[in-house]
Regions:
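C-terminal motif of bacterial Sec signal peptides marking the signal peptidase cleavage site
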Residues: 15-18
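Short, positively charged
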Residues: 12
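All-alpha RGS (Regulator of G-protein Signaling) helical domain and cognate RGS-like helical scaffolds
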Residues: 20-302
C-alpha cells in the first residue's frame, strides 16, 4: 500500500470517528420507562375512551369500573392532576353505577370509612389544607342537618353525620391548634330555597342537596390546589427524581440505597393517603350526581 493510500485511510477514519452514531428512529422512545403518573393516565384515558365509545354495554360497564380506580391513581401519582383524576373517577363511577343498573346489577357508590380517613394522619400536606377540608365537611354536615329537619328530599341525618365525622377526622389529621370549623353557619339562602337553588358557579338551577355536595367537593379541591397541586413534591417528584421543592433536580451524590428505599416508601404511603382524600372528594361528587347535579364536563371543570 502506498503512503498516499495510507494517508487517505487515516484521514477517512479520523473523519468517521468525529461523527456521532446515527439515531435509530423510535429507539429513544422505546427505551423510555413511563412514570407511575404516565402509566396511570394512559390506562385511565384508554378505559374512559372505551366507556364513552360505541361499544357493547358490558364492555362499557367493565371499562367504567376499571376507570374508577385508574383515575384515583392519577390523582395520587400525578402532581398536577389531582382535581382531574378525582372528578374523572367520580364520572366513571357514576357511569358504572348507571350502566350496572341497566344490566340489572346492584352497584353502589364508594364511601370512605372512618378507619381509612384516620390513615390520612401524616400525609405530606400543609395542616391548613386539611383544616380547610374539615371546614368544608362541617359546613356541608350542618346544611344537610337543617335540610333533613325540613324533610328535604335527599337530605338525611346519616348523610349529615358522615360529613361531620369526616370533618372531625380531617381536623385531627391536620395537627392544627385552632379548630377552623364554625359548627354553626349562615343558612339564610338555604332556608329561602331548601329544595332548589341557583349554582353561582354555573348558573344552573339544581337541587339544594346536590349543590351542598358539589360545593363541598369544590372547596376541598380548591384547598388541595392551594397546597401546591396536591402535595407537589417537597421530597420526590412522581418521575422518581429527588427535588428541592422548586422543581430543580437535586445533584447530591451521597444518597445511599437505604435512603432511596426510605424515600420510595414514604412516597408510596403518601400516594395511598392521597387516594383516600381523592376518594372522599369523589364520593361528594357522586352524591351530587345521585341527587341531581349534571355530570357533564362543562359544569365540573373550571
Amino acid at each position: 500500500m502506498c503512503i498516499r493510500d495510507r494517508l487517505c485511510i487515516t484521514a477517512l477514519c479520523g473523519a468517521l470517528s468525529a461523527c456521532s452514531a446515527p439515531r435509530i428512529d423510535g429507539r429513544a422512545e422505546s427505551e423510555h420507562q413511563p412514570s407511575a403518573c404516565e402509566s396511570a393516565y394512559w390506562a385511565a384515558d384508554a378505559s374512559t375512551a372505551t366507556m364513552n365509545g360505541r361499544h357493547h354495554i358490558i364492555m362499557r360497564y367493565l371499562a367504567a369500573k376499571q376507570a374508577v380506580g385508574q383515575w384515583s391513581e392519577v390523582a395520587a401519582t400525578c402532581t398536577q392532576r389531582f382535581a382531574q383524576g378525582t372528578i374523572r373517577s367520580a364520572q366513571a363511577e357514576h357511569m358504572a353505577v348507571t350502566l350496572g343498573t341497566r344490566l340489572g346489577g346492584n352497584d353502589t357508590y364508594r364511601t370512605v370509612s372512618d378507619d381509612s380517613l384516620r390513615q390520612v394522619l401524616g400525609i405530606d400536606l400543609d395542616g391548613a389544607t386539611l383544616g380547610a377540608m374539615s371546614l368544608a365537611e362541617d359546613r356541608a354536615g350542618f346544611v344537610m342537618e337543617v335540610l333533613a329537619a325540613r324533610d328535604t328530599p335527599g337530605a338525611t341525618l346519616s348523610r349529615s353525620d358522615r360529613h361531620k365525622t369526616a370533618g372531625q377526622l380531617l381536623f385531627t389529621a391536620s395537627g392544627l391548634s385552632r379548630d377552623p370549623r364554625e359548627k354553626v353557619y349562615d343558612i339564610q339562602k338555604i332556608l329561602a330555597s331548601p329544595t332548589s337553588m341557583t349554582d353561582s358557579t354555573t348558573g344552573l338551577s339544581v337541587p339544594t342537596t346536590a349543590l351542598t355536595e358539589i360545593d363541598c367537593a369544590r372547596e376541598q379541591l380548591a384547598a388541595m390546589a392551594d397546597d401546591g397541586a396536591s402535595a407537589k413534591s417537597k421530597h420526590t417528584d412522581k418521575t422518581g427524581n429527588n427535588t428541592n421543592g422548586n422543581g430543580d433536580t437535586d445533584s447530591a451524590t451521597d444518597t445511599t440505597d437505604v435512603n432511596a428505599t426510605d424515600t420510595n416508601t414514604v412516597g408510596t404511603e403518601n400516594d395511598a393517603r392521597l387516594r383516600v382524600l381523592s376518594t372522599l372528594i369523589s364520593s361528594h361528587i357522586t352524591s351530587a350526581f345521585a341527587l341531581g347535579y349534571p355530570d357533564m364536563d362543562a359544569f365540573l371543570f373550571s
